[in-house]
């Protein structure tokens, strides 16, 4: 249970730091940090816990919630629309669509499926490690 709480607090701190940084970071760097850092924290602590399915469920639930709050926070900033326009001009050679509209269900679904897939893979890896030892 302590690893579950540690994971939730660590991921909350990550999204808190990203919220504090706000729009002072490149959009691609922010996207990569959002995708890599929370799953790395969750993955490392997943191998230490005994609550496999509970751990996976609560991590996905809370990381999705943190992601939602982070996006709502960014979109509420006064410079958000000009920031998106400037970032899209900078990324014109890369095929990325970023809009200033509210993010929707598809982003949360992608993030949930991404987290679920990674944690299921880690679950099976953990089972294989246990059976070999």
UniProtKB/Swiss-Prot annotation:
The gene is msa. The keyword Transmembrane helix applies. It comes from the Bacteria. One of its GO terms (cellular component) is plasma membrane. It is a multi-pass membrane protein. It comes from Staphylococcus aureus (strain bovine RF122 / ET3-1). Signal peptide: none annotated. This is Protein msa. It is found in: Cell membrane.
């Amino acid at each position: 249970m302590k690893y579950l709480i540690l994971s939730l607090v660590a991921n909350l701190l990550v999204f808190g730091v990203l919220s504090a940084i706000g729009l002072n970071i490149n959009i691609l760097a922010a996207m990569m940090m959002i995708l890599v850092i929370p799953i790395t924290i969750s993955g490392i602590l997943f191998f230490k816990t005994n609550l496999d399915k509970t751990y996976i469920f609560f991590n996905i639930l809370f990381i999705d919630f943190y992601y939602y709050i982070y996006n709502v926070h960014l979109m509420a900033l006064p410079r958000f629309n000009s920031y998106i326009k400037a970032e899209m001009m900078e990324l014109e050679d890369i095929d990325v669509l970023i809009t200033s509209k509210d993010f929707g269900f598809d982003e949360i679904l992608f993030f949930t499926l991404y987290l679920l897939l990674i944690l299921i893979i880690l679950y099976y890896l953990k089972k294989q490690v246990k059976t070999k030892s």
